[in-house]
A protein has these predicted regions:
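Sequence-level preference for short, compositionally simple segments enriched
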Residues: 1-153
């Protein structure tokens, strides 16, 4: 079943979500807590394709999630479908299916200044790579902005 890909706020908890390419897509503010996201082998692409509108505070937030897949080094955490995509992944286990660079710019060099792809205290083989310079590693203080209470209050 599909969730709407429109502006709005969505909350997913203890959910299993799978897909091939861009299976988390759209412009909503969506908070994923303790979810499992499986990249299927036929996809070989991207978990997220954020399209947050300019000025929207949040995009996709993943907290205490598991990113799994069967084929090593075949997927990215995300790419910017639109120039202001926002994806933050915190405290999550990243499998070895995620490429070392983690994020892809989809040949949108100008988006390096406008997208916000960030990580915080992730672990696992896919979290250990060298991320692009235009992505962010959050500090403890910055990560507080991405709690459930901060996003939905």
């Amino acid at each position: 079943e599909f969730a709407p890909r429109i502006n709005g706020r969505q909350y997913y908890k203890n959910t299993y979500i799978c897909g091939g390419v861009d299976f988390i897509f759209g412009s909503a503010t969506a908070y994923f807590e303790n979810c499992t996201l499986e990249s299927l082998p036929e996809g070989g692409g991207y978990v997220t394709a954020g399209s947050s509108p300019k000025g929207q505070t949040y995009g996709y937030i993943f907290n205490h999630c598991r990113f799994i897949g069967s084929e090593p080094n075949t997927c990215y955490l995300g790419r910017p479908w639109r120039e202001y995509a926002k994806v933050v992944i915190l405290n999550s286990k990243i499998g070895d299916h995620i490429k070392p660079e983690g994020w892809h710019d989809w040949s949108k060099i100008d988006a390096h200044d406008t997208v916000y792809f960030a990580e915080y205290k992730n672990y696992g083989p896919g979290a250990a790579g060298a991320r692009p310079s235009w992505t962010h590693t959050l500090t403890d203080t910055e990560a507080e902005k991405y709690t459930y209470a901060s996003v939905f209050n």
